[in-house]
Amino acid sequence: MSAVSCSSVRATVAPKAVAKRDVAKAAKAAKSVSLAAPAFAAASLAGPAFAATEALSQTADGVGVAVGGAAAVAAVGGLLIATDPNKRREDMKSSAGGDEAKSVADYFNSTGFERWNKIYGETDDVNKVQLDIRVGHQQTVDKVLDWTAGMDMNGVTVCDAGCGTGSLAIPLALRGASIAASDISSAMVGEAEQRYNAEVAAGKKAPAVAPKFEAIGLEECSGKYNMVTCIDVMIHYPTDRVNGMISHLASLSDDKLIISFAPKTLAYSILKRVGELFPGPSKATRAYLHAEEDVEAALNAAGFKVTRREMTATQFYFSRLLECERA
C-alpha cells in the first residue's frame, strides 16, 4: 500500500534521548517556577496546568502563572469575565484575511516556528516552562512509540498528520515504516526533513521507502494508510470542526488511528482562562479543549473504537492520548 499525502495543523518534536536527559532538569525547574501576576502571589500549589492551551504560547515566552487552591481560583473570577480571548482570536483571523487556517500557518511559519523549534530541539536555551513542555510532549510521543514497539513496522504505511518537526515521523521511519508526514507549516516540514536527513547521515538505517515530507493543509490530506497519527493537533481546532477533522482522519486509516488532545475538564478550563489573562506580546495561536466523551463519540461515528488511552500531565502540559482501531 503506498503512502500518498496527509497533513494537519501541528505536532512537534524532541529526540527521545534529549527528553530523558531533560526529565530531571524539568522536575527540578518545575519546583521553582515563579508567579508572574501579583494578583496570584499567594498561590503555591503546582498541579497540571496550562499545558497545550492558550497559556502554552505565553508561557513559552517566559510568562508563568500558577494557581494554588480554590481560594486563588475564586479570586480571579472577575478577571476571567473581564477578558476577551475571542476578540484576540478574531483579530488574528482578520489579519489573515479571515482565513483561520492561513492565520495558523502564518504563525507557525514565523514566530511560532522559532519558539517551538527551540522547545522541541536539543538546545539548552529554554526557560523552565519551555523545558517542562518539551518533556511533556516527548512523553506523549514516547507512549505512541511504546504502543507500536511490538509491531513490525517494515512496509507499514503511516500518515503522520501535523508532523511538526518530526518527533514521531522520524523514529517510525527509522523503524522501516513508509511515512507520509505533513504539516500546514512549510518551516516545520523543512525542519523535519533536515532532522531526518541528519539521522541517516549519522548512521541510522534508512527505510526502504524514504519518508515524504509535505507542506499541505488537512483538507488536502488523501490516500489510504495502515495507521494514521495526529499528535497535539486538535488543540488548534474549534469544537465545531473537530467532528469533521476526526471523520477525515478516520477515512484515511484502514486499521489504526492514534490521536491526542487537551481534555476539557472544569479544572483545565479554569486554568486555560487564567492563561488568557496574560496573552503576551507574541501570543498568536488559539487553543481549544475538547470533552473526551465528544471525541470518543466522533470516533465511534467514524467506525473506530478506543482500545487504549493514556494521560500525560506535567506542570505546563497535558494531553489525552487515544489508540483506536476499526470497530
Functional labels for PLM-detected ranges:
Residues 61-114:
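N-terminal auxiliary segments of SAM/dcSAM-dependent transferases
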Residues 159-161, 165-217:
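Class I SAM-dependent methyltransferase SAM/SAH-binding core
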Residues 229:
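A conserved beta-strand element that flanks and buttresses the S-adenosyl-L-methionine
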Residues 237-248:
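A short, conserved alpha-helix within the catalytic core of class I
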Residues 254-263:
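Conserved beta-strand signature within the Rossmann-like core of class I S-adenosyl-L-methionine
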Residues 285-303:
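Short alpha-helix
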